[in-house]
Structures are given as structure tokens and as C-alpha cells.
């Protein structure tokens, strides 16, 4: 709350919007990158038993925590793979949905990450998620610059809501984007060609 200046309702609102790109009763292939500790998504994946979910993270420690959560929930449809979002080890068009919660502000090579996510998404597929954008909340911007960057949690440069919308519109056929304080959420659909 101190950093993001959000109450629980605001936090829940941006997460709900970010996850709204995953269709109800989804039964396709989903890539989550980065999975982090899985705290936000493992309970959701319990409701998607017919889907094929791959969770990728650069950090073996974070991924291990997510895998423990999946094991506790007896998730049989979720697999884990260590890797780099800038060089995804998947074929072109391998996924129906790519989900990225709170990741892009940390990725060191954001251009490669955007390119790779687009590459592994099938035509007509959905890219959805959320991450920090600068210029929406002064207090958050200060913490990011003076605390999180030094701890290695965030890596500049950062998008603004405007630059993110423009970037996504260059790649995707449809883009829905909003902000809640310093967080942007988005749902994009890749064109059919």
C-alpha cells in the first residue's frame, strides 16, 4: 500500500482486468511469463483443469515456490520451465494465451520480450497482463527509482501508459488498456495474419 498507494479494491480491480483476457472455461494452451511465486495465478489455474499451462521464469527460486503451490493444489495441467523471456524455447504460434503479470518492468531486454511474446502467440491469440508504468503515481515512481531499481527488482526504461498503448497497437489487432494508479493492465488480440 505504501508504494502503490492502492487499497484492496483497486488492487483487485487491476488484476481482474489483467486476467480478463483468459476466457472462462479456457481449454487451450497458456504461457505465463514470468510466473514468479505463483501467488496470483495458481488458484486461478485450479479453475481451468482442461487447459495446458506452461509457467516460465528466469529465477529458479521463484519458480520453485510456484511449483510448490501447484503441487499443494494438485494441479496436473501446469508445467514449469526455467528460461528467458527474451529467448523463449517454444515454436512460433505455440500458445493461445500469453499472460504476463508484473513482469515487463523487470525484464532487462524489453524489446526482445515483446518480440518473443508476439512470436509464440498463435494468430488470433490473446496477450494479457499488467505491469508498472511511470508517470501515473509520483510516490510509486519515486520508490521504483530509489528503492526497487537498486534492489534489482525493476529495470529501466519503463513504459508510460501512452507509450505502452502505442507499442501494443503496432503489433496487435485490438488493444484494451487501462491504468490503476501506477499499474497498467491490458488485453490484446493478435491479428489472424
Residue map of PLM features:
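Conserved class I S-adenosyl-L-methionine
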Residues: 1-26, 39, 43, 142-148
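A short SAM/SAH-binding and catalytic strip from SAM-dependent methyltransferases
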Residues: 97-109
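A short acidic, Gly/Pro-enriched loop at the edge of an enzyme's catalytic core
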Residues: 86-97
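A short glycine-rich, Lys/Arg-flanked "PGG" loop and its adjoining helix->strand segment in the class I
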Residues: 111-123
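C-terminal lobe and adjacent flexible extensions of AdoMet/dcAdoMet transferase-like proteins
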Residues: 187-193
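Short glycine-centered segments of the SAM/dcSAM-binding site in methyltransferase folds
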Residues: 29, 124-126
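Class I SAM-dependent methyltransferase SAM/SAH-binding core
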Residues: 29-87
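C-terminal alpha-helical "lid/dimerization" subdomain adjacent to the S-adenosyl-L-methionine
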Residues: 2-8, 128-180, 184-186
